Amino acid sequence: MRIEPYDSKHFENCIEIIQSNTPKYIDPSEHSDYKDYLLRNDKTYFVLFNDFNLVACGGYGLNKSGAKVVLSWGLVHSQHHNKGYGSELLKYRLNHIKNNYPDTEIHLDTSQHTYRFFERFGFNVKQISKNGYGEGLDKYDMILK
């Protein structure tokens, strides 16, 4: 397993990953936002490879005031769920944040399908928005304590 910074050559693989998680985990309306995000130059985003393939991606960003870091677009290809890739990529991102932005709050938003995963790493639910991502996909705002 290896993790490296995202490069535009990874674009199609990342699109395949988000599509594999739609509609259960990702509302189709989010695809255009994700594509726009991947095209930006001001992001910190990583890709994770198993022995052969790109199987996960995720990053983070600093909010405009610099008061908090927000995890962004953490995705594991649906064929590779529950194999530890999401955990490894999350730990990598959290360590990267700790080294670059010590003592900065870490926030994220996720759905009812994955919030318990983040609770295992110390995140706490701050707010739940019913259908926050789309019909049947509730938005859970979380913070790392």
Task: Give, region by region, the residue ranges found by the protein language model.
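Short hydrophobic/aromatic beta-strand element in the GNAT-like acyltransferase core
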Residues: 43-47, 57, 73, 107, ...
